Swiss-Prot record:
Annotated protein name in UniProt: Large ribosomal subunit protein uL3
Organism whose genome encodes this protein: Blochmanniella floridana
Family: Belongs to the universal ribosomal protein uL3 family.
Subunit structure: Part of the 50S ribosomal subunit. Forms a cluster with proteins L14 and L19.
GO annotation, cellular component aspect: cytosolic large ribosomal subunit
Pfam families according to UniProt: Ribosomal_L3
Keywords, alphabetical: Methylation, Ribonucleoprotein, Ribosomal protein, RNA-binding, rRNA-binding
Function: One of the primary rRNA binding proteins, it binds directly near the 3'-end of the 23S rRNA, where it nucleates assembly of the 50S subunit.
GO molecular function term, any single one: structural constituent of ribosome
Post-translation changes: Methylated by PrmB.
GO BP annotations listed: translation
Keyword Ribonucleoprotein: yes
Modified residues (N5-methylglutamine): 151
HAMAP family tied to this protein: Ribosomal_uL3_B (MF_01325_B)
Length: 219
């Protein structure tokens, strides 16, 4: 398993050995308890289901509560799944995964729910250019312009970039450098910013593009 669930604690800065100041994000990753192992014969795919953190039983619905109580595992904040290869047959229910899973990884991808910014215009939401400041333009400086064609096709195509709700959607930041792993305090420090507000749950996985970049650099 090369992915873990963490909680965004916020940002800070550290000074490396060369004296360069680096902005980092602190992610708290508590121990993960395996609650179910799925296989291809029974479930159609291979995956491991985990829970982490602590919560009160009244915060869980009946199916999750019964599932965890049956296994005798502490009530976590939720259930998450991570895909496995067919070769990962040694994982069983009750196993514990910690930050040591990421110890030999230099780059990670972090997935979370981005900050919600409410209703936004096309300039802010899609980086449209503004219209002329003068030359006859009046009250349309930040308007998007035409959204269609003529009688043919006579409609607005789906996916047209227009004003609307900005943020609060799934976002992934790729190839973030791992600055430090503090196993004692369950902290992971990554370079740069990650999606979400402070306290948001995020998924930390091994970077999927780092191998590709290494291949390209050797050509």
């Amino acid at each position: 398993m090369d992915g873990l669930v963490g909680r965004k604690l916020g940002m800070t800065r550290i000074i490396n050995e060369e004296g360069i100041m680096i902005a980092v994000t602190m992610i708290e990753i508590l121990p993960h308890y395996v609650t179910q192992v799925k296989n291809k014969e029974k479930d159609g795919y291979c995956a491991v289901q985990v829970t982490t953190g602590n919560t009160r039983d009244k915060c869980l619905n009946k199916p999750k509560l019964g599932h965890l109580k049956k296994l005798g595992i502490n009530y976590g904040k939720g259930l998450w799944e991570f895909r496995l290869n067919d070769s990962n047959r040694l994982i069983s229910v009750g196993d514990i995964f910690t930050l040591k899973v990421l110890k030999c990884i230099n780059k990670v991808d972090v997935t979370g729910i981005s900050k919600g910014k409410g209703f936004a215009g096309a300039v802010k939401r899609w980086n449209f250019r503004t219209q002329d400041a003068s030359h006859g333009n009046s009250l349309s400086h930040r308007a998007p312009g035409s959204i269609g064609q003529n009688q043919t096709p006579g409609k607005v195509f789906k996916g047209k970039k227009m004003a609307g709700h900005l943020g609060y959607e799934k976002a992934t930041i790729q190839n973030l450098a791992v600055i430090n792993i503090d196993i004692k305090n369950n902290l992971l420090l990554v370079k740069g910013a990650i999606p979400g507000v402070i306290g948001e749950n995020v998924i930390v996985k091994r970077s999927v593009k780092i191998g590709y970049f290494k291949e390209m650099s050797s050509i």
